[in-house]
């Protein structure tokens, strides 16, 4: 992209504005997570899952409204594959009885349908707790491995900058899931596919950040007399074309998945869309500026020690 071929944008000079912007997003995310929380899927709170054929025509919304009074709780209803629907119910009890009520209700309310249960699954509370714990450990473990990897490849300030950026990305994405749940026409429940999306976001954001860090390290050896802030700004600008092209093409694919992938993948693709946008932003305005602040503080301490 020629518009970024000789880019010389003052990203570093505007980092304080970026701090304010990120701070507002993080504050909103924390407030929403504390007050509204997250809507957990049956993977993490237990329940039943049914894949039903021959009942797609009425639509997910109509089926959900018909089943809610019968089941005593609002089920999650999504289109599944080419012809089936997926029904998830956060309920305990006899799965055969719940299945019977679902099938009978659909037949009575929508006579034109011929519902047949293709597959059933049940997630017990203990197994759901194990899955929840495993999801938390997987994200924290990924962050720890990333910290050690960058520590070995660069230095601890770069490691901290990368991990801060990743926490920033995951927290804001989680906050949006909490804030927007119930306001969007698709489910934003946290299940195993969403955890996979978060791990993908972590990897994608890290990739952008490492590219910038690698260029910073290269330019630190070439421009030894330049102030570190100028080196960082030059590094961000020279990798900007690659960052925008990679993010733009990936985002295009994920948007297509969001539009045409069906309701089952809508929450997953929404998480990726948010993560790619926030991750691209953080690789420019969060990760590298954190390194600048840490090095500036270290230099200030050295000057203070020398003055004494």
Curated annotation (Swiss-Prot):
List membrane-spanning regions: 18-38, 134-154, 160-180, 193-213, 244-264, 272-292
Q: Does the keyword Secreted apply?
A: no
User: What is this protein identified as?
Assistant: Protein translocase subunit SecF
Cellular component annotations (GO), alphabetically ordered: plasma membrane
Cell compartment(s), UniProt:
Cell inner membrane
Species of provenance:
Rhodothermus marinus (strain ATCC 43812 / DSM 4252 / R-10) (Rhodothermus obamensis)
Give the superkingdom in one word. Answer: Bacteria
Which keywords, in A-to-Z order, does the entry hold? Cell inner membrane, Cell membrane, Membrane, Protein transport, Translocation, Transmembrane, Transmembrane helix, Transport
Gene Ontology MF, one: protein-transporting ATPase activity
The record's annotation in Pfam families points to: Sec_GG, SecD_SecF_C
Keyword set includes Methyltransferase: no
Q: Which NCBIfam families match?
A: 2A0604s01 (TIGR00916), transloc_SecF (TIGR00966)
* Entries under InterPro entries matching the protein: SecD/SecF_arch_bac (IPR022813), SecD/SecF_bac (IPR022645), SecD/SecF_CS (IPR022646), SecD_SecF_C (IPR048634), SecD_SecF_C_bact (IPR055344), SecF_bac (IPR005665)
Q: How does it sit in the membrane?
A: Multi-pass membrane protein
The entry's function note states: Part of the Sec protein translocase complex. Interacts with the SecYEG preprotein conducting channel. SecDF uses the proton motive force (PMF) to complete protein translocation after the ATP-dependent function of SecA.
Q: Into which family does the record put it?
A: Belongs to the SecD/SecF family. SecF subfamily.
Q: Main site of residence?
A: membrane
GO BP: any one term? intracellular protein transmembrane transport
Looking up HAMAP family in the UniProt record yields: SecF_B
According to the record's subunit comment, the protein's assembly and interactions are: Forms a complex with SecD. Part of the essential Sec protein translocation apparatus which comprises SecA, SecYEG and auxiliary proteins SecDF. Other proteins may also be involved.
